[in-house]
Amino acid sequence: ASYKLADGLNLSGTFGMNTTLNKSTNLTPFGYAVDGKMGYAPQGALSKGKNDRKVYTMDVKGDYAKNFGDISTESVVGFQAFQTITKNMSGGGQQFPGPGLQVLGALGSNSAGSGFSEVIEAGLMMQTRVGYMDWLYATAGIRQDANSAFGADFSTITYPRFNVSFIPTAMTGGAIGPMSTLRLRMAWGQAGQQPGAFDQYTTFLPWASEFGPGLSPGNVGDPSLKPEVSTEIEFGGEVAFL
């Protein structure tokens, strides 16, 4: 949805949901090893799995543009949020009691498992571009992100950016020697990637055996884990010849 609130002032928003449901079944029928030479599950085996993933998105932004003589300005303020919910279930086992019974409850030995995770990521973005007489442009922006993977003790992380674009051929009003168009630019900025839902924490997994229930190591974890931050510097240009 998009709305024009005033001259040069616009508000837009996008909301969506993406859902994916995967189901899998792996069946080895009872008595498949008729020659007696197959060692795996001669009385049959069955495994089933289901993975349900939903991603909810929200993107709202407002932009404002205005000219002051030879100076043009464009400003954007936006907010983004993502919620990812993942649910999975699995079960399987071996030893059917006879032909025709191809359900998990008929297996002589079986196991089951399930999992659930929810990650919420939100970000606030602000950017302003200032231009002078169509030949000099400067853009400055900042983004603040928060992620539920770090728990209640983590607040936000900031990613700034800045770039400049200079067009000498526009400043002179025509070609410079054999060059019909010349554009020079420089950019500096930071970006990052958030970790998974439980990457920071030490986790354990349930474990079942003939000796009884127990736990096995899961994720090793890192209490000092922070968002990944990368810094990029770019110099470039574009040129066209007559």
Predicted regions and their residues:
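Extracellular/periplasmic, surface-exposed regions of secreted and cell-surface proteins
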Residues: 1-28, 40-242
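N-terminal, polar/charged subdomain of small-to-medium soluble alpha/beta proteins
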Residues: 34-35
